Amino acid sequence: EFLAYAEELRPYIADTGVVLDEIFSEGKNVLFEGAQATFLDIDHGTYPYVTSSNPTAGNASTGSGIGPRYIDHVVGVVKAYTTRVGEGPFVTELLDTDGPGHQIRETGHEYGTVTGRPRRCGWLDAFMLKYSARLNSLDCLAVTRLDILDKMPKIKMCVGYKIDGQEIKQIPASLNVLAKVEPVFEEFEGWLTDITSIRTFDELPVQAKTYLNRLSEVAGVELGIV
């Protein structure tokens, strides 16, 4: 019975690496899209609170069967705020039940697609983003869900970490140390207007542009898509 199924599937199965190599030899481009997030990476994430694979950019090569030299542009996709599913460290998490954390969750419908479990929400951690930019060799950022912050009068962004009152330069490798860090926040004025119909960066309110430009500055990566 199952061998019959195999014959039905045979025309759709091939060595992906070979297929992609032929496409590249024709001068065509291929877009690879990853899932999950850098800090869920089994090698570079917040182990043991990780997934079982490598969601980082390098897996575009190992997962597809192409050589790493074929990858010549990497776009980092990041929400305008930070979320996490399940357990694990979350430096900028908002634990309120009726404040900005709740507002982000409800406005952004931040609930698990399959389980319906509420996602943990917090202010954007640009310090983590800086680590991710280095690890993934990001060329630019694609910032999503900026409109979820439309009704926020004040917006915060984490631009660094402190331990015992002293700022640190890198994210600690030890979860025990990471649990002790305090976020260094910068506060921004909200734009308090609906931006969902805006289609160019220049049309954005000045407050939104200020927020995005600071995000780019801290991460060390230019904005590519908003």
Where are these regions (language model features)?
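Non-transmembrane, aqueous-exposed alpha-helical and coiled segments at domain scale
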Residues: 1-226
